[in-house]
Swiss-Prot record:
One GO process term, biological-process aspect: organic phosphonate metabolic process
Protein name in UniProt: Ribose 1,5-bisphosphate phosphokinase PhnN
SMART domains membership: GuKc (SM00072)
Source organism of this protein record: Pantoea vagans (strain C9-1)
Family per similarity comment: Belongs to the ribose 1,5-bisphosphokinase family.
């Protein structure tokens, strides 16, 4: 059975780096889904399809998102094309949201494989400061949010160390859960 890997983790945990590493050397039968976001394409961060609020509303009204949510002042959508990829036997990794995991579970059922990327608070704080997008108050809020318990059934993947180690661990998880 093809799986939808719902990758979550706090901002700064390394989700984008992990997805970039998978894109560079993808395992067989694995696709990395892009997200539709109401954020400029050149805003930095992940490779995504930038939509205006109006475009996002129109696509949502047409049922073109399998899952969508709002966070940090932006709207995010995972396109229905991911369901076609799954039907064709491809595993799909998406940059998901732990707060919207239940919505993804309702849509994808047993095909969903939630993976939660974690880093220690000290590493997370250092990464957030290094990227320079948040002030100290926002960093404190993100650290508090990251300290909340992970959802039940989420496989934990630590990313404190070298990215290559995390990629290797994720590949092992994918092999075990096919």
């Amino acid at each position: 059975m093809a799986r939808l890997i719902w990758l979550t983790g706090p901002s700064g945990s390394g989700k984008d780096s992990l997805l970039d590493a998978l894109r560079a050397a993808p395992p067989p039968r694995l696709l990395i889904a892009h997200r539709y976001i109401t954020r400029a394409a050149d805003a930095g961060g992940e490779n995504h399809v930038a939509l205006t609020e109006t475009e996002f509303d129109r696509r949502a009204a047409l049922g073109l998102f399998a899952v969508s949510w709002e966070a940090h002042g932006f709207r995010y959508g995972i396109g229905c094309e991911t369901e076609q990829w799954l039907l064709r036997g491809q595993n799909v990794v998406v940059n998901g949201s732990r707060l919207h995991l239940a919505q993804a579970q309702a849509r994808f059922g047993s095909q969903l494989l939630p993976v939660c990327l974690q880093v220690t608070p000290a590493v997370l704080a250092a990464r957030l400061r290094q990227r320079g997008r948040e002030d100290e108050a926002e960093i404190a809020r993100r650290l508090a949010r990251a300290a909340q318990p992970q959802p039940d059934g989420c496989l934990i993947l630590n990313n404190d160390g070298a990215l290559a180690e995390t990629v290797c661990q994720l590949r092992q998880i994918l092999e075990l859960h096919q």
